[in-house]
């Protein structure tokens, strides 16, 4: 489990939020590795020996740009957003794609199994709900803490199947490439091994009514070695589309 250092300045809202996740409260930072820091009105991810940190902020910077420009993105075409599908994001991570999808007016159920990442994302959604510019978008995201492959079958029984299951599995870290930003390096170190790709894709194809959309690097291998029905390809990213079991490609 991940350590969390709760500063005296942490608000009651932050203290309440972190109690929802299995984190280990500590009185000082660990000697090495990563930990969460709760201070003021924010939860951040820290790496011992580094000055920078990672927070989930949907109200500014790159997240704001993607939110306001999301309608023209390839992801919008991949999920056929004009049909207003319901989307389950089975690998939510830091929530960037979930937020873009929600900014398109879609209802998104997001799953994240790592407690520290889920805490960071939950905190980002909480703060986005307080901002007039992002509150409507944030309200369309429903975060579930846990393993999507385990939770989706049970959720189908109570809510029915979603139109789309969206997958963005963690790519192998490109250690020699400058393209790996420090934030993602923190993320890789925190999360470690990715979910079982075969089980994840299999469950997604059992769950979706219309399609499974998988985000990959443009030249990356197919998820679980399985070829998709078709693709949407951009300059650096592509979206592989798989049909649900029993669906007719035509």
Curated annotation (Swiss-Prot):
It catalyses: guanosine(1516) in 16S rRNA + S-adenosyl-L-methionine = N(2)-methylguanosine(1516) in 16S rRNA + S-adenosyl-L-homocysteine + H(+). GO terms for molecular function: rRNA (guanine-N2-)-methyltransferase activity. Pfam families: SAM_MT. Keywords: Cytoplasm, Methyltransferase, rRNA processing, S-adenosyl-L-methionine, Transferase. Its main location: cytoplasm. The keyword Endoplasmic reticulum does not apply. SUPFAM superfamilies: S-adenosyl-L-methionine-dependent methyltransferases (SSF53335). InterPro entries: 16SrRNA_methylTrfase_J (IPR007536), SAM-dependent_MTases_sf (IPR029063). S-adenosyl-L-methionine binds at residues 96-97, 168. Its EC number is 2.1.1.242. It is found in: Cytoplasm. HAMAP family: 16SrRNA_methyltr_J (MF_01523). Belongs to the methyltransferase superfamily. RsmJ family. Specifically methylates the guanosine in position 1516 of 16S rRNA. This is Ribosomal RNA small subunit methyltransferase J. It comes from Neisseria gonorrhoeae (strain NCCP11945). The lineage of its organism: Bacteria, Pseudomonadati, Pseudomonadota, Betaproteobacteria, Neisseriales. The gene is rsmJ.
